[in-house]
Amino acid sequence: FIFLFCLGILCSFPMQGQQRDTQKEYNVDSTLYAYYMRCKAEVSSPIVMQMSDTLFLMAEEQGDQRMQAVALCNKLDYYYYKNNQPDSINHYVEIVKDFAKKTNQPKYYYFAWSKRLINYYIKQHQNNIALYEANKMMQEAEQEQYMDGIANAYNVLSSIYQLKRLYSLAIDNKKKEIEITLEYGLDKYNLSTTYSMLGGLYSLTGKT
């Protein structure tokens, strides 16, 4: 039950910024956006790899580095959802992180690290590796004072501690995630879900 509850938590967090209306939110070129949607529809098919290369080049011509990062994330997502090629997941996590670092896009840097690499380890019950990566990510985000990265670290730490049945630590990290989101005015798109998750953690302890 506990693993299924936590797995539901992981699945409830799609790529933030892609699930909403990307075209309006980021003022994406209509042709580029239409092709992005075609790529998104093929994320479970090997063809998405070639399509993502095309999307990357189209975005480069438009000078849209954000969509270039999205194109690389599409490749990562293909292997992430296949869930059986850890070397490929690690490879594309590093590709996304490297491009995001070079183009000053920390959102995608920490997305690849937390929502893909660490969540993959969590799904594989490799909680000690996930914890190592989460603590390393927290340290880097704190050094950079990147609050969204810190919030992401609290998010995955909560999931890891939950699977380890360390519910007090899971609750503490979930509360810190909420606190930093509110204090620094971070993206509140999933905040109601986060509160629900906190309630679920309290229910596991028998507390209200």
Residue ranges and their predicted role:
Residues 1-2, 147:
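Accessible peptide chain termini
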Residues 2-12:
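Bacterial N-terminal signal peptides
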Residues 18-208:
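A "functional boundary" signal
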Residues 13-17:
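Sec/Tat signal peptide C-region and signal peptidase I cleavage site
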